[in-house]
């Protein structure tokens, strides 16, 4: 939940940060890009380090670093210092996401792992719903710095909980030596696999279609829909409700229907929502609730697709699942950083172009899945 909190909580504070530090809106948005780029880069290392040193140790150290970075963000008096500490947050925030998936796969397999991953998605979906609403209240009642103080306190609670209750799922005899040549060899194997690109692309492009609206929220909600900082829940509650319901559906269906059929159901929601989003904004002006309703159904579809495809990706290299999880998360987050830093600023001034951008991401994801499915079926026939 740390990742969503560190992204979504401070979005309502963008105008306040801009006024406080006397910078442009683009410079404030680059704090999100800096975080995402650092997050993506470190994704490549969290899993590899956890494969060598154990899952629990990496999570505890990364939480401590994130807590320090949150204090730095709260104390930043220039945009440059805020960029630096957001980078430090990004370097540490992803450990729970990557290592957590590896822990699940260490202990469980098959439908049980798929169900647990869906359950984790449901629990984690609470954060993006609460975060922007909480951020809006905080920035209205106090100031934007209090948001980062909240993140510091929240992280302290996580450190205590993990230190006391989180077990080590990777015993020493199953760990791999942390060696640069070994890492290069492992990364080369993963990044030379066409199936990895196709399956990671499936998840990444689906996510990008939703994250486009997350990155554009300060403009989409305040300028196009006329909402205040306290109105961010109008977008994030439907999105997160969709993630929760989609993950619940995926959890219930895991093992009951073939994975490919579950993905097909997911794309029925994804494609339908994206098409309706484009059609509505071409014909009508943006308005609540119609402008955010497609995001609800889009999120349902995304959560139907992600668990099964993620497990397929992890099983491409069973002996180095930590590294595979890192590479997949890096791909997803790197695309998210491009969306936040390049695509969202270009498209966010027009609700129609935002909808078209989301539709384009769905088409890319469907193409990746189609090619991945063909490759998988071809492998099974040989």
Give residue spans per PLM region.
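A late C-terminal transmembrane helix in Major Facilitator Superfamily
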Residues: 311-348, 357-358
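Juxtamembrane intracellular "pre-TM" segments in multi-pass secondary transporters
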Residues: 169-200
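Cytoplasmic helix-loop-helix junction between adjacent transmembrane helices
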Residues: 85-126
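Conserved MFS/SLC helix-loop-helix module at the cytosolic interface between two early adjacent transmembrane helices
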Residues: 41-79
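Paired small-residue
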Residues: 65, 69-72, 80-88, 289-295
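Helix-breaking motifs and short loop linkers at transmembrane-helix boundaries and internal kinks
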Residues: 20-22, 54, 75-81, 92, ...
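Helix-loop-helix hairpin linking two adjacent transmembrane segments in secondary transporters
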Residues: 81, 110, 118-164
């Amino acid at each position: 939940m740390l990742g969503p909190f560190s992204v979504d909580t401070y979005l309502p504070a963008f105008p306040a940060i801009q006024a406080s530090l006397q910078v442009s809106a683009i410079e404030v948005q680059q704090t999100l890009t800096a975080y995402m780029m650092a997050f993506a880069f470190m994704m490549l290392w969290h899993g590899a380090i956890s494969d060598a040193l154990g899952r629990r140790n990496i999570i505890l150290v990364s939480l401590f670093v994130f807590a320090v970075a949150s204090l730095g963000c709260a104390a930043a008096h220039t945009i440059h210092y805020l960029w630096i500490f957001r980078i430090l947050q990004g370097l540490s925030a992803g450990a729970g996401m990557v290592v957590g998936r590896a822990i699940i796969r260490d202990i469980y397999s098959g439908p049980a792992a798929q169900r647990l991953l869906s359950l984790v998605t449901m629990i984690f979906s609470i954060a993006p719903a609460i975060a922007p609403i909480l951020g809006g209240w905080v920035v209205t009642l106090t100031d934007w710095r209090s948001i980062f103080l909240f993140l510091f306190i929240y992280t302290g609670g996580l450190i205590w909980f993990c230190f006391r209750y989180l077990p080590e799922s990777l015993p020493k005899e199953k760990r791999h030596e942390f060696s640069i040549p070994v890492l290069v060899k492992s990364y080369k194997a993963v990044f030379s696999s066409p199936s990895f690109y196709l399956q990671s692309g499936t998840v990444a492009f689906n996510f990008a279609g939703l994250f486009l609206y997350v990155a554009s929220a300060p403009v989409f909600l305040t300028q196009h829909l006329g909402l205040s900082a306290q109105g961010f829940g109008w977008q994030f509650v439907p999105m997160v409700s969709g993630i929760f319901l989609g993950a619940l559906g995926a959890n219930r269906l895991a093992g009951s229907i073939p994975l490919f059929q579950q993905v097909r159901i997911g794309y029925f929601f994804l494609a339908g929502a994206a098409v309706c989003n484009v059609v509505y904004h071409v014909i009508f002006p943006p308005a609540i609730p119609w402008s955010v309703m497609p995001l609800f159904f889009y999120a349902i579809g995304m959560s139907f697709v992600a668990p099964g495809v993620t497990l397929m990706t992890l099983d491409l290299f069973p002996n180095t699942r930590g590294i595979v999880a890192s590479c997949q998360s890096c791909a997803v987050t790197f695309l998210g950083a491009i969306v936040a830093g390049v695509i969202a600023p270009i498209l966010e001034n027009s609700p129609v172009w935002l909808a078209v951008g989301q539709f384009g991401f769905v088409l890319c994801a469907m193409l990746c899945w189609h090619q991945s499915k063909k490759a998988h079926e071809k492998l099974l026939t040989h």
